[in-house]
Amino acid sequence: MQFLTAVSPQSSSTPSWKIETKYSTRVLTGNWTEERRKFIKATEKTPQTIYRKEYVPFPGHRPDQISRWYSKRTVEGLPYKYLITHHQEPSQRYLISTYDDHYNRHNYHPGLPELRTWNRHKLLWLPEKADFPLLGPPTNYGLYEQLKQKWLPPPEATLRESIYTSSYPRPPAGAMSRREHAIPVPPPRLQPVPHF
């Protein structure tokens, strides 16, 4: 096996008067900026993407529908009926909010004992108040119905009113001050008005 050693182009034996600059073959000459931007298509082989190389298609393969179904079920979560229904109680019976329970009803709940016990196995105070929601109609003091009656026009009204017109109704006629006029009296220096 023969090893080649790189020889310096200007060795120490070269006289100084023969020293000439050596140019590289990779010197950029001519229209190198324009030629650099030209697209040269690889004719020997079309370049392959990573996806095409690593993921080979299988023509007879069918997707696994069962795993798709399980993943879809996991992403969607529980259906609406399992989230809203509680002990098969109708949803309009337990719409009392926690705020209303704490501040207006003062934690009054007839179904729960006054003192809860500590469960050492579950590490919880039982019974939990969240498991036994307050049953009853929602407390909404009629504000929603009042605003709904104000916002929605009566069914017999066909003309659409603007928000300004509906917000500022016309006051009744009795609220306005009546304009009263004095009886005109002619000045005395003029001729008297003839009477017939």
UniProtKB/Swiss-Prot annotation:
InterPro entries from the UniProt entry: CFAP107, CFAP68/107
Tissue expr: Expressed in trachea multiciliated cells.
Domain of life: Eukaryota
GO-annotated biological processes: flagellated sperm motility
Main location as per UniProt: cytoplasm
Residue ranges crossing the lipid bilayer per the database entry: none
Name assigned to this protein: Cilia- and flagella-associated protein 107
Location of the region described as Mn 2 in the Swiss-Prot/TrEMBL record: 96-108
Region of interest (Disordered), ranges: 168-196
Segments of skewed composition (Pro residues): 184-196
Organism of derivation: Bos taurus (Bovine)
Keywords, sorted A to Z: Cell projection, Cilium, Cytoplasm, Cytoskeleton, Flagellum
Short name of one Pfam family: CFAP107
Subcellular location: Cytoplasm, Cytoskeleton, Cilium axoneme; Cytoplasm, Cytoskeleton, Flagellum axoneme
Role summary: Microtubule inner protein (MIP) part of the dynein-decorated doublet microtubules (DMTs) in cilia axoneme, which is required for motile cilia beating.
Region (Mn 1): 46-61
PANTHER family in alphabetical order: CILIA- AND FLAGELLA-ASSOCIATED PROTEIN 107, CILIA- AND FLAGELLA-ASSOCIATED PROTEIN 107-RELATED
UniProt gene name: CFAP107
GO (cellular component) term, any one: sperm flagellum
Assembly and binders: Microtubule inner protein component of sperm flagellar doublet microtubules.
